[in-house]
């Protein structure tokens, strides 16, 4: 298998052409004809992750957050230069899939959580098209027990909570990463709790004034789910050497 073959497998799974994304999906740095020897999968192509990929002798790094985003300046200097330099001098091909890995119903950052936790009557959720998140229902549970359940699942503490809603809940909506503004969409769809990664000052007032529960578990914690699932998928389809790199980032 070469990188072009791997890209075909990933594109057939994730359908990146359906998304108006914030950056390019697919090969960002490298040679499409390079052979795939070992794939490292991670959340973000930061320098710490790149160094881990080098240390484990990977020649492909597959991430959720790549190097390039809309509106970035063109010069390749500073932090971006350092990251690219380490990739190129170690012959590591960088592949990134952003929104497609959030939205996927099997290996995505959102649907995978809902299915693993046994939510039922699952539907797409979110104000974007295609929708990135998921909503569902479950047996009634106290909100504090629900927080504990999610903390155990994500292996991360809740970073922020605004409990403006019911003390016992039976429905939730989830969009991983930086989606706290979707709390209003969650209220409009009459769910009891909205879960995301990031939070900001308005979320507190919104949760209490809209009478909904809001939970934030960190951008990184909520977006490890998809890369981990993608690691297992690649093993199942015949990629012999694939590892998930868990770089520390509590945000």
UniProtKB/Swiss-Prot annotation:
Listed binding positions for a divalent metal cation 2 are 65, 219, 223
Leader sequence segment: none
Could you identify this protein by its name? GTP cyclohydrolase 1 type 2 homolog
Give the source species: Chlamydia muridarum (strain MoPn / Nigg)
Q: What are the record's GO terms for cellular component?
A: cytoplasm
Q: Which UniProt keywords apply?
A: Metal-binding
What sections of the sequence does the record tag as coiled-coil? none
Under the subunit heading, UniProt states:
Homohexamer.
The record lists a divalent metal cation 1 as bound by 64, 102, 223
Top-level division of the source organism's lineage: Bacteria
Keyword Repressor listed: no
């Amino acid at each position: 298998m070469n990188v072009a073959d791997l890209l075909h497998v990933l594109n057939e799974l994730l359908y990146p052409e359906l998304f108006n994304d914030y950056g390019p999906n697919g090969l960002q740095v490298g040679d499409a004809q390079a052979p795939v020897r070992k794939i490292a999968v991670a959340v973000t192509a930061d320098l710490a992750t790149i160094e881990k990929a080098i240390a484990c002798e990977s020649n492909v790094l597959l991430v959720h957050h790549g190097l390039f985003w809309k509106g970035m300046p063109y010069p390749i200097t500073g932090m971006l230069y350092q990251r690219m330099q380490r990739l190129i001098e170690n012959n590591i091909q960088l592949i990134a899939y952003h929104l497609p890995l959030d939205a996927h119903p099997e290996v995505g950052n959102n649907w995978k959580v809902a299915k693993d936790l046994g939510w039922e009557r699952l539907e797409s959720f979110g104000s974007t098209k295609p929708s990135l998140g998921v909503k569902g229902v479950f047996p009634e549970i106290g909100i504090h027990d629900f927080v504990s359940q999610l903390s155990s699942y994500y292996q991360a503490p809740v970073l922020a909570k605004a409990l403006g809603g019911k003390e016992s809940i039976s429905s939730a909506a989830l969009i991983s990463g930086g989606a706290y503004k979707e709390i209003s969409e969650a209220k409009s769809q009459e769910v009891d709790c909205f879960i995301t990664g990031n939070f900001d000052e308005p979320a507190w007032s919104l949760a209490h004034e809209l009478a909904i529960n809001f939970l934030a578990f960190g951008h990184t914690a909520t977006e490890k789910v998809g890369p981990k699932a993608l690691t297992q998928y690649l093993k199942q389809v015949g990629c012999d050497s694939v590892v998930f790199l868990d770089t520390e980032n509590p945000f």
